[in-house]
Curated annotation (Swiss-Prot):
Subunit structure, interactors included: Interacts with ATG8.
Expression across tissues: Constitutively expressed.
GO biological process: aggrephagy; autophagosome assembly; mitophagy; piecemeal microautophagy of the nucleus; protein processing; protein transport
MF terms in GO: cysteine-type endopeptidase activity; protein-phosphatidylethanolamide deconjugating activity
Job of this protein: Cysteine protease that plays a key role in autophagy by mediating both proteolytic activation and delipidation of ATG8 family proteins. The protease activity is required for proteolytic activation of ATG8 family proteins: cleaves the C-terminal amino acid of ATG8 proteins to reveal a C-terminal glycine. Exposure of the glycine at the C-terminus is essential for ATG8 proteins conjugation to phosphatidylethanolamine (PE) and insertion to membranes, which is necessary for autophagy. In addition to the protease activity, also mediates delipidation of PE-conjugated ATG8 proteins.
Protein name (database record): Cysteine protease ATG4B
Subcellular location: Cytoplasm
Stated family: Belongs to the peptidase C54 family.
Enzyme Commission number, as recorded: 3.4.22.-
Comp. bias intervals (Polar residues): 1-15
GO cellular component: cytoplasm
Keywords: Autophagy, Cytoplasm, Hydrolase, Protease, Protein transport, Thiol protease, Transport, Ubl conjugation pathway
Positions annotated as active site in the UniProt record: 164, 361, 363
Amino acid sequence: MTSLPDRGVSSSSSDPLCEGNIAPCSSSSEQKEDCSLKQSKTSILSCVFNSPFNIFEAHQDSSANKSPKSSSGSYDWLRVLRRIVCSGSMWRFLGTSKVLTSSDVWFLGKCYKLSSEESSSDSDSESGHATFLEDFSSRIWITYRRGFDAISDSKYTSDVNWGCMVRSSQMLVAQALIFHHLGRSWRRPSEKPYNPEYIGILHMFGDSEACAFSIHNLLQAGNSYGLAAGSWVGPYAMCRAWQTLVRTNREQHEVVDGNESFPMALYVVSGDEDGERGGAPVVCIDVAAQLCCDFNKGQSTWSPILLLVPLVLGLDKINPRYIPLLKETFTFPQSLGILGGKPGTSTYIAGVQDDRALYLDPHEVQMAVDIAADNIEADTSSYHCSTVRDLALDLIDPSLAIGFYCRDKDDFDDFCSRATELVDKANGAPLFTVVQSVQPSKQMYNQDDVLGISGDGNINVEDLDASGETGEEEWQIL
């Protein structure tokens, strides 16, 4: 779908402020000149007298006409400002006029204390804003691409304006793979050669049928759930597409080389304990154990597991009672963030601060790249972004999906404990619940059944349209 009404970054992922752009504020040339001078001086003063993270957005359409006088009069000041910002640890939010506050940031299970007072007294958070940006910019950023091979039998060689949900889901799954192979503390290195596992992960998300988790293969896997080139789908159908793709990919690899390309079990959580419509999704511990057993080819040992929990938390807008619960999921060490955004506009929400969601935006258009699995000298800059965008939590689409990664049995038990505590805080309206087992009548294991697919194999995905509104899905929460 169309992008959020934010101003974007360059396709090279560089910071627009470091490119000398300033915010437009008037249509007349005289007003532009005065405004430009005022902005330049004000920005300099902000850098000198304010905290390092009180830097306002400064971005301008490159096609705008510039006054000769303002160009010559403020260019030197702008160069000074650019040098100050680019050489230090300063950073800003882009997309709104809101500056970063000193409140704590929860980002994929990790807390960053940005208060200058707390930073000065706590050595672990001395450079909270800088360490957060390092973490943020190390996350895999997957965006619209153009110039790839046509998708299946279609003529689409780009996913611009319709592929944002696919790209958002790729980002979430990519983080799970990064956490699994490289750990939560991994940061993108500043020098080459890169870690082979890191390059291997990027290769899997390339834009061709040869790449395991490409947009081409996701659309093919999700065809029965309404995924098609040129069409937008909701998070529920997207989760089901991943379920199908992972299963198909696993079967193919077992036949060819006996290896697993997706190194964890996948559990799409939906339905309720009694199968009644309208109930909260239920994480069933026995089902998770069975999925891990199947992943390990019948062995009883626990395996890593990725949980995807699709939800609908309202009708036209999100029910406010769920917002505190959503925020708390980012405090879980197992957090992988949320597939969500404004209605019809998907983003990858990876953190929260106060009442704002912090996200990676897939709506930047970049050329398709081909990163070979063994090219440890590859240019990976188009897969990372240092621009943090924010969105009010009460504006996100009620149709979303939450992701969690549990490395082992202890990690899964910790997740269940935290989820149960969250249920206790929900006042009767939890995001999802946790139970030990399903009813005796449902004990016979069937992958489609335990993953929430109805007996006739049909799932109504037509209600998940571009407006973000939904119909009567069995997992809907009102």
